[in-house]
């Protein structure tokens, strides 16, 4: 049977790998399986999803920020479409969008990756490696 390359990948690579994880860890929930399969990428996306509202517009870091030094991330996470699969209905703005997207003026959160991104946060905050910050400074309670 002759299939298009994408179908070959789905049928003979992706599905068998996914089924191997399901067989090896039958009691894991979705988050557990995705953590095993995608590692730090999934954990970062999950954390971002859990700490932003659905209507958030997130300034997403460049591929250089995600892959610098001994980063735990792979290059895929810097791809806007890849990240949106996990973060939808949130919107992402990447540095390439500056001057091209009307969402640039609506950014509500800044993704911090490998210690980069603090320059977009308009208030002082203690530095950390990976996380998400709102553009508006949270009120002290």
What do the PLM-derived regions correspond to, one by one?
Residues 6-18, 77, 81-89, 93, ...:
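Generic hydrophobic, helix-prone segments enriched in Leu/Val/Ile
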């Amino acid at each position: 049977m002759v299939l298009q390359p994408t179908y070959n990948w789905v049928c003979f690579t992706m599905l068998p790998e996914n089924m191997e994880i399901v067989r090896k860890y039958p009691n894991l929930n979705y988050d557990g399986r995705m953590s095993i399969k995608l590692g730090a990428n999934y954990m970062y996306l999950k954390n971002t999803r859990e700490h932003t509202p659905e209507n958030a517009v997130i300034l997403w870091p460049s591929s250089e920020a995600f892959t610098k030094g001994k980063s735990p991330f792979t290059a895929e996470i810097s791809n806007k479409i890849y990240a949106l699969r996990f973060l939808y209905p949130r919107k992402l703005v990447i540095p390439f969008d500056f001057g091209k997207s009307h969402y640039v003026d609506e950014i509500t959160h800044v993704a911090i990756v490998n210690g980069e991104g603090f320059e977009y946060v308009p208030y002082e905050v203690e530095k950390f490696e990976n996380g998400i910050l709102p553009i508006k400074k949270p009120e002290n309670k």
